[in-house]
């Protein structure tokens, strides 16, 4: 197992990919705010003539992307962690390879139940639903406030069933 701190430059990212290709479980950190932006950051650090090759390479070695954000709790004591989870299933790997990173968010939404993926909005919604964070905090952190507001509105819809929390939260509750 190899842990690479901040992957900021081409040389470091190139080394991480090379190490992962040799079969070593490789962890790296980047300061990004979504799974898609993480993948774009890795690819974009390379010159344009190499990016197709890097997309193919990354699609083969990527094992997961976890983005996290610590948010102030509603009760004012401590922080709650919102997280985005990307699990590279065959569809995700294909989107990376075909340079369709912009479609990953939709694939993550669809892969919540089956693959354990989760968008930040799904995580924010679960934290808000459990009253761990305020609506203001949830909306401030959301990159798609309309989507999050729709999720929240469905929760309060008369006669409507409350949506189930994202898979990681549902499992932790058991």
Task: Name these PLM-found stretches.
Residues 1-174:
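Short, flexible helix-loop junctions that flank or precede catalytic/ligand sites
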